[in-house]
C-alpha cells in the first residue's frame, strides 16, 4: 500500500466518508462498510481529494490529453484534480464535464469546458452499475475523442449479478483501464494493521469472501 493510499483511508474515516457497521446497499446486500464520496463537501475536503486523485494518477501508467467529469458528482472531482495538477505538478490540463440535459440557448449542447479531443480520462467517485460511465464513453466517442481510462476513488472489488464487477465489465467491453485511489484490498490491509478495527476487519473480510471478485 502506498503512503497516499493509507492517508486517504485515514482521511475518509475521519470525515466519515468511509464508515463501518451494517448498511443496506442499492443491490439489497447488507454491507459491513459504506463509502459516501458526497461527504467530501467542504473546501478543505475538496482540496484534499484533489491531492489524492492526483497522487493516484501520477502513480499510474494512464496516458491522457484531457480530463472529463460525469455529471453530477464527477464535476467537483475533475475540477479539484485539474487545480491540483496545476498547483502541485505545474500542469495545464484541459477539462470538461457534461450536463444531464442539453442547453438550447447560449453555447448550447451537453458539454461544458474544453472541447473533447484526444485521449480523455474520465474522473468519478465510484462505479456501481457502470451506467454513467457507459453514457460518458458514448459522449466522448460521439465527439470524435477517445476514452483513455477511468480514475475513481474506490474500487469495491465486488461482483454484480454475474461473476464480474461493473469495473471489470467496463475494462473488458471498452478495453480501457480503471484506476482507483484505493481498492477494498487496501482497506482490508489497513484494518488488519490496526487492532482497533479487528472486528471490522473480520466482517469486511467475510463480505469480500462472499461477494468479492478475483483481484
UniProtKB/Swiss-Prot annotation:
Orotate binds at residues 34-35, 128, 156. One of its GO terms (cellular component) is cytoplasm. It holds the Pfam family Pribosyltran. Transmembrane segments: none annotated. Keywords: Glycosyltransferase, Magnesium, Pyrimidine biosynthesis, Transferase. It catalyses: orotidine 5'-phosphate + diphosphate = orotate + 5-phospho-alpha-D-ribose 1-diphosphate. It is an enzyme of class 2 (transferase). InterPro entries: OPRT (IPR023031), Or_phspho_trans_dom (IPR004467), PRibTrfase_dom (IPR000836), PRTase-like (IPR029057). GO terms for molecular function: magnesium ion binding; orotate phosphoribosyltransferase activity. CDD domains: PRTases_typeI (cd06223). Pathway: Pyrimidine metabolism; UMP biosynthesis via de novo pathway; UMP from orotate: step 1/2. Homodimer. Catalyzes the transfer of a ribosyl phosphate group from 5-phosphoribose 1-diphosphate to orotate, leading to the formation of orotidine monophosphate (OMP). This is Orotate phosphoribosyltransferase.
Amino acid at each position: 500500500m502506498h503512503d497516499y493510499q493509507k492517508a486517504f483511508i485515514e482521511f475518509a474515516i475521519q470525515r466519515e466518508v468511509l464508515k463501518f457497521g451494517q448498511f443496506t446497499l442499492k443491490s439489497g446486500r447488507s454491507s459491513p462498510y459504506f463509502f459516501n464520496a458526497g461527504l467530501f463537501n467542504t473546501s478543505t475536503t475538496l482540496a484534499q481529494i484533489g491531492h489524492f486523485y492526483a497522487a493516484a494518477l501520477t502513480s499510474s501508467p494512464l496516458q491522457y490529453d484531457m480530463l472529463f467529469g460525469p455529471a453530477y458528482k464527477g464535476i467537483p472531482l475533475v475540477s479539484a484534480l485539474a487545480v491540483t495538477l496545476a498547483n502541485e505538478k505545474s500542469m495545464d490540463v484541459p477539462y470538461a464535464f457534461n450536463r444531464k440535459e442539453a442547453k438550447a440557448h447560449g453555447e448550447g449542447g451537453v458539454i461544458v469546458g474544453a472541447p473533447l479531443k484526444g485521449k480523455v480520462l474520465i474522473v468519478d467517485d465510484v462505479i456501481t452499475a457502470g451506467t454513467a460511465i457507459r453514457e460518458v464513453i458514448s459522449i466522448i466517442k460521439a465527439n470524435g475523442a477517445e476514452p483513455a481510462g477511468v480514475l475513481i476513488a474506490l474500487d469495491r472489488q465486488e461482483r454484480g449479478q454475474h461473476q464480474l464487477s461493473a469495473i471489470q465489465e467496463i475494462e473488458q467491453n471498452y478495453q480501457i483501464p480503471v484506476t482507483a485511489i484505493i481498492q477494498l484490498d487496501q482497506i482490508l490491509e489497513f484494518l488488519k494493521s490496526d487492532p482497533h478495527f479487528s472486528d471490522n476487519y473480520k466482517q469486511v473480510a467475510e463480505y469480500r469472501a462472499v461477494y468479492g471478485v478475483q483481484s
